[in-house]
Amino acid sequence: MSKPLCSTGLRWLWLVVVVLIIDLGSKYLILQNFALGDTVSLFSSLNLHYARNYGAAFSFLADSGGWQRWFFAGIAIGICVILMVMMYRSKATQKLNNIAYALIIGGALGNLFDRLWHGFVVDMIDFYVGDWHFATFNLADSAICIGAALIVLEGFLPKKQA
């Protein structure tokens, strides 16, 4: 017997749409207003810097000849499907897990769109301290990391009694 979607974690799919709009919108603005490698200082320790990532996190496998584009696209699709099944199986009231899953799905879809449309992921956030720069990243990456952190956090919280 099927259950109403609004009673499942899929009720939180609106957050996927919000993440996608913000992520793709920020990437569109970078692509329209920056040349590759351009940098604009926002404030101390934070720049906007247009970079292309042909690999995964920290440009992992970026120089692998192109096959990695499809490999990482497949991983993103698989993760999105698995997390949507998990959202369907969970209750809408399990907010922390469902928010985490929605953030990860939204981020994964944002980067998947880049891979399929451009052949690379658009990165633009350059955080640094002194001369040390963290890897350039984007809002989709941030959503994925926040979602993963929420899943870890949920594991440490006491379970509610049924």
Curated annotation (Swiss-Prot):
The listed locations are:
Cell inner membrane
In the UniProt record, which is one GO cellular component term? plasma membrane
Q: What is this protein called?
A: Lipoprotein signal peptidase
Q: Does the keyword Transmembrane apply?
A: yes
Please name the InterPro entries in this protein's record.
Answer: Peptidase_A8
* Protein's membrane topology: Multi-pass membrane protein
Pfam families under this entry? Peptidase_A8 (PF01252)
Looking at the UniProt entry, the stretches that span the membrane are: 12-32, 70-90, 102-122, 137-157
Active-site residues annotated for this sequence? 123, 141
GO biological process terms, semicolon-separated? proteolysis
Q: Which organism is it from?
A: Citrobacter koseri (strain ATCC BAA-895 / CDC 4225-83 / SGSC4696)
Which reaction equations make up its catalytic activity? Release of signal peptides from bacterial membrane prolipoproteins. Hydrolyzes -Xaa-Yaa-Zaa-|-(S,diacylglyceryl)Cys-, in which Xaa is hydrophobic (preferably Leu), and Yaa (Ala or Ser) and Zaa (Gly or Ala) have small, neutral side chains
The gene behind this protein is: lspA
Keywords for the protein's UniProt record, in alphabetical order: Aspartyl protease, Cell inner membrane, Cell membrane, Hydrolase, Membrane, Protease, Transmembrane, Transmembrane helix
Q: What pathway is this protein said to act in by its record?
A: Protein modification; lipoprotein biosynthesis (signal peptide cleavage)
